């Protein structure tokens, strides 16, 4: 299971590297702290929740452009990456 999570985290990093308006803090955990340009994080959070994809927003003013996105199964990774790609 750890190998799958590591593989999916790497996949998410590669996909985010290819996206405009998205960056992330490299992680050794099972999530990525993902930063979006402008106020995109709030809009993305709301749109992802409507799709049944739950990510964690932050109320701290320094993190208002950020979402914590957990690394999951290959299917979950595909779902979240496709949703974000469609929304940005």
Please report, for each region that a protein language model flagged, where it lies by residue.
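N-terminal/domain-start segments enriched in small and hydrophobic, helix-friendly residues
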Residues: 1-3, 88
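A non-catalytic, amphipathic alpha-helix used as a structural packing/dimerization or gating element
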Residues: 3-11
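Conserved PLP-binding catalytic core of the aspartate aminotransferase-like
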Residues: 5-6, 16-51, 67
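PLP-dependent enzyme catalytic core of the Aspartate aminotransferase-like
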Residues: 47-51, 56, 60-88
């Amino acid at each position: 299971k750890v190998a799958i999570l590591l593989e999916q985290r790497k996949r998410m990093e590669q996909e985010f590297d290819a996206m405009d308006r998205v960056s992330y803090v490299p992680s050794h955990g099972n999530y990525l702290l993902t930063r979006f340009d402008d106020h995109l994080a709030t809009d993305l959070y709301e749109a992802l929740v409507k799709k049944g994809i739950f990510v964690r927003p932050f109320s701290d003013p320094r993190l208002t452009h950020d979402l914590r996105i957990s690394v999951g199964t290959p299917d979950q990774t595909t779902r979240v990456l496709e949703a974000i790609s469609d929304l940005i």
